[in-house]
Regions:
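Short amphipathic alpha-helix with an adjacent loop that forms part of the alpha/beta core around
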Residues: 35-43
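Acyltransferase
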Residues: 172-187
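Two-component/phosphorelay signaling modules centered on CheY-like receiver
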Residues: 17-25
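Catalytic beta-strand/loop cores that center a nucleophilic Ser/Cys/Thr
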Residues: 112-159
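Cysteine-nucleophile active-site neighborhood
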Residues: 43-117, 181-183
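Extreme N-terminal starter segment of soluble prokaryotic enzymes
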Residues: 1-4
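Active-site beta-alpha loop architecture of Rossmann-like, nucleotide-cofactor-dependent enzymes
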Residues: 12, 53-55, 172
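A short beta-strand-loop structural module common to alpha/beta enzyme folds
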Residues: 26-34
């Protein structure tokens, strides 16, 4: 299997790549503005990395989702998760309280296979100031996990193999993070 990570200029991207390599999978990293969409054709799965800012400012990130939705499985992390939400019609909300390097519990609803084998309550590492808004949430997506403060921490597309997590699976603050990535790779 070959996986590509779209790097949204985030310091965590290579931690995520290292985690994928640890799981025995060939991984390539492309910066979000230094490739052409057709270069993703040889890859089996796409991971959309965390990053600063908002999805519309992240190079080809939104174009990747639009072109490969329904064609290639995707996992969006943090900014990548937000981009998935926006690509399918969700809006983002800027949080009043910023979460940077904060461990909090969240509840996953058992409806996404990336959480397979986990307890309903899991600890997650949060590094964000934006979230996908629950208001007017798109019909084509399911909320798969929420934080105790009601923020969407996970989503998936109802028809496509597309999953998003607001938190960082590669962080030591997310003890089940490696399992989440492994589950995505095995889908």
């Amino acid at each position: 299997m070959k996986v590509v990570i779209i790097d949204n200029y985030d310091s965590f991207t290579y931690n995520l790549a290292h985690l994928v390599k640890e799981l025995g999978v060939d991984v390539t990293v492309y910066r979000n503005d230094q490739f052409q969409l057709r270069e993703l054709e040889p890859f089996d799965k796409i991971i959309l990395s965390p990053g600063p800012g908002i999805p519309s400012e992240a190079g080809l990130l939104m174009d990747v989702i639009r072109k490969y939705a329904g064609i290639k499985p995707m996992l969006g992390v943090c900014l990548g998760h937000q981009a998935i939400g926006e690509a399918f019609g969700a809006k983002l909300t800027n949080l009043k309280e910023v979460y940077h390097g904060v461990a909090t519990p969240c509840t996953q609803f058992g409806i996404d296979r990336i959480f397979q084998g986990m307890e309903k309550r899991i600890e997650i590492g949060r590094y964000h100031s934006w979230v996908v808004d629950r208001t007017n949430f798109p019909e084509c997506l399911d909320v798969t996990a929420v934080s105790d403060d009601g923020c969407i921490m996970g989503l998936k597309h109802k028809n496509y193999d597309i999953h998003g997590i607001q938190f960082h699976p590669e962080s030591v603050l997310t003890p089940e993070g490696k399992t989440i990535v492994k589950n995505f790779l095995e889908l």
